[in-house]
Amino acid sequence: MTERTFSIIKPDAVKRNLIGAILTRFEQNGFKIIASKMVRLTREQAEGFYAEHQGKEFFAPLVEYMMSSPIVVSVLEKENAVKDYRTLIGTTNPETAEEGTIRKDFALSQRENSVHGSDSIENANREIAYFFTDCEIFER
């Protein structure tokens, strides 16, 4: 079944000019990019996006990191998009990520791990709606 998932190219990757390399990986792995834009998160946006982590020790540093540079948010589409995207990006910790995954190849650390990906269809839908209106998403 064709699904949509949500992606963020995070500040560490944007600062190192890896946007093109990462978007190319998406397309090489069968994903259609049906929406994409560069944004600079406000504190309110970053805190809202990561609200489920509020009160945790890593919340404040995560918010600061996500505000440190523009990010690229995208909506990707393909069969089994959520699962396949999670496989493509690899585990959160790049040291344990499989060879050939985006995080193994590009991430600097567990926090500066280059990309975010939705972990369920429900979260993908919520995250897509957080950043995109329906008129910004295009069928291809």
Curated annotation (Swiss-Prot):
Its EC number(s): 2.7.4.6
Keyword set, alphabetical order: ATP-binding, Cytoplasm, Kinase, Magnesium, Metal-binding, Nucleotide metabolism, Nucleotide-binding, Phosphoprotein, Transferase
Reactions listed under catalytic activity: a 2'-deoxyribonucleoside 5'-diphosphate + ATP = a 2'-deoxyribonucleoside 5'-triphosphate + ADP; a ribonucleoside 5'-diphosphate + ATP = a ribonucleoside 5'-triphosphate + ADP
Transmembrane segments: none
UniProt-listed Pfam families: NDK
Listed GO MF terms: ATP binding; metal ion binding; nucleoside diphosphate kinase activity
Listed GO CC annotations: cytoplasm
Cofactor: Mg(2+)
Subcellular location(s) per record: Cytoplasm
Alphabetical list of InterPro entries matching this protein: NDK-like_dom, NDK-like_dom_sf, Nucleoside_diP_kinase, Nucleoside_diP_kinase_AS
Binding-site residues, ATP: 10, 58, 86, 92, 103, 113
Active site per database record: 116
BP GO annotations: CTP biosynthetic process; GTP biosynthetic process; UTP biosynthetic process
Function: Major role in the synthesis of nucleoside triphosphates other than ATP. The ATP gamma phosphate is transferred to the NDP beta phosphate via a ping-pong mechanism, using a phosphorylated active-site intermediate.
Subunit note: Homotetramer.
Family: Belongs to the NDK family.
Protein name: Nucleoside diphosphate kinase
Lineage, uppermost ranks: Bacteria, Pseudomonadati, Pseudomonadota, Gammaproteobacteria, Pasteurellales
The gene coding this protein: ndk
